[in-house]
A protein has these predicted regions:
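AAA+ P-loop NTPase catalytic core and its hallmark functional loops
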Residues: 1-190
């Protein structure tokens, strides 16, 4: 799967000048809100978009909570698209109990690493297509399992004062994946 991503990414060309330099926060919020409405027919108020932007400025890890149907998953996806970025949605399962559920696992019998959706998203974020763009990974419905169990390694790295790194998985021609600087993790829960 990861080789397919590499092949699809070769020869990527950045689309010319869709974006301009905004003058102030109000203009950024207006631009994002208008793009989200035009691209996805999603309508968020200015306060919601300002809070989301403020959160992004403060931390790389966010938890969006609210009742079903309020747009917890749609917001990061539409926001990333409005800024020319991308959001990958990783569905958390009720049975997730350890790091293998989030990071995948190595099968010693077939001598193959079975990457998870989360690792595929991290890998995609490192591809040249997204080298200078926002990339958001959404762990959707995190309330279905305990993040302390399946995401302990990720939480530990994100809370560390040093630059976060991923556990050594040895992907990409024996090079371990790096966590891109413009990668943001979002979680949703009710």
């Amino acid at each position: 799967e990861l080789e397919r991503m590499d092949a699809a990414d070769s020869g990527f060309q950045d689309p010319p000048g869709r974006f301009h330099q905004p003058a102030n926060l109000k203009q950024v919020v207006d631009d994002v809100r208008n793009r989200m409405a035009a691209d996805e027919a999603l309508f968020y108020d200015d306060r919601t978009i300002r809070c989301f932007l403020g959160g992004l400025a403060m931390s790389r890890l966010h938890l969006l909570q609210g009742i079903s149907g309020t747009g917890k998953t749609s917001l990061p996806r539409a926001f990333a698209k409005a800024l020319g970025g991308h959001a990958d949605i990783v569905a958390v399962q009720a049975g997730w109990r350890d790091r293998q559920d989030l990071l995948g696992y190595y099968n010693a019998f077939d001598k193959k690493y079975h990457e998870s959706s989360f690792v595929k998203a991290l890998y995609a974020a490192q591809c040249p297509t997204w080298s200078d763009r926002l990339f958001i990974v959404v762990l959707d419905e995190m309330n279905l399992s305990y993040i302390e169990q399946f995401g302990a390694d990720l939480l530990s790295e994100l809370e560390s004062p040093k630059k976060p790194n991923l556990p050594q998985l040895g992907l990409m021609d024996s090079r371990p994946p790096r966590r891109p600087t413009r990668l943001l993790e979002e979680g949703t829960a009710i």
